[in-house]
A protein has these predicted regions:
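Conserved ABC ATPase "signature" region
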Residues: 103, 107-130
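Conserved ABC ATPase signature
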Residues: 134-138
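Conserved catalytic motifs of ABC-family nucleotide-binding domains
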Residues: 155
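Catalytic Walker B motif of ABC-type/P-loop ATPase nucleotide-binding domains
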Residues: 159-163
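ABC ATPase "signature
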Residues: 218-219
């Protein structure tokens, strides 16, 4: 990235604490326009905390967070109005149909040709026959398709995804993966949280591996390998199986821990 390019996401000394429990240790992160950045870790690694702090869903205990020039701690509502988010384990409103919810989001986002866009995304996700079914009566996979459609419908400049392919069958996983890669080629930027390492190799320009709220390493997939024969799974097991101190030498300038309190 050129030095003159300002990051779309910039967090300095960002941390989250609940009383004496540190959910996310202080860290710095930058994501620039056109990047597909991924955060990967085992279950319970606090990946979701990472993304919720950046998107204003949680308030950081400390640190400065700017996303698209908006201070996430001071104005989370303005921030959420300007990005796309697919949260983990969140369903569309049970009392709305997919068509109604898509229309609501499209109006909120100022989308042109709303009726046309709603039909396009219902068809794209194979949901045309469920367009007027109450969301509470949809399957988990169908509800996830609705959530993805609401994030895609306005083609946001910056898209945050937390385990986006949960409950999707392989056909729609692949279809969504191809759309996301094209979105980045068209100038979009994506911040992804997942435990599926295959997504890093297929999709990410850069990635970070975290565990117990600590960043163990960050960089390109190739750059994280200490030997060409290493697989990403080898890298993951090596890093997650070691302490944060042992992992220090694998860090990249993209994500770094701040000095801890």
């Amino acid at each position: 990235m050129g030095e003159e390019t300002l990051p779309l996401v910039k967090a300095v000394d960002m941390a989250k604490r609940y009383g004496d429990f540190i959910a996310l240790h202080p860290l710095n992160v930058e994501v620039h326009a056109g990047e597909f950045f991924g955060v990967f870790g085992p279950n319970g690694a606090d990946k979701s905390t990472f993304i919720k702090l950046l998107t204003g869903q949680l308030r950081a205990s400390k640190g400065n967070i700017e996303v698209l020039g908006v201070n996430a701690r001071e104005d989370p509502q303005k921030l959420k109005a300007n990005i796309g988010i697919v949260p983990e384990s969140e369903s569309p409103p049970s009392f709305l149909t997919p068509a109604e919810f898509l229309e609501f989001v499209a109006r909120l986002r100022g989308v042109d040709d709303i009726a046309e866009k709603v039909e396009y995304w219902l068809n794209w996700f194979g949901m045309e026959e469920k367009r007027d079914t109450m969301c509470k009566d949809l399957s988990k996979g169908q509800r996830q398709k609705v959530m993805l459609a609401t994030a895609f419908i306005h083609k946001p400049k910056l898209l945050f995804l937390d385990e986006p392919f949960a409950n999707l069958d392989p056909i729609y996983q692949r279809k969504c993966r191809e759309w996301l890669l094209q979105h980045v080629k068209d100038g979009g930027t994506i911040f992804l949280c997942s435990h599926i390492l295959e997504m890093a190799e297929r999709m990410c320009n850069r990635m970070a591996i975290i565990n117990h709220g600590k960043v163990l390493a960050a960089g390109t997939v190739k750059g994280l390998k200490i030997d060409p024969s290493e697989t990403l799974e080898d890298v993951f097991i090596r890093l997650v199986g070691h302490s944060i101190e042992d992992a220090e030498r694998f860090k990249d300038e993209g994500v770094k821990h701040s000095e801890e309190e």
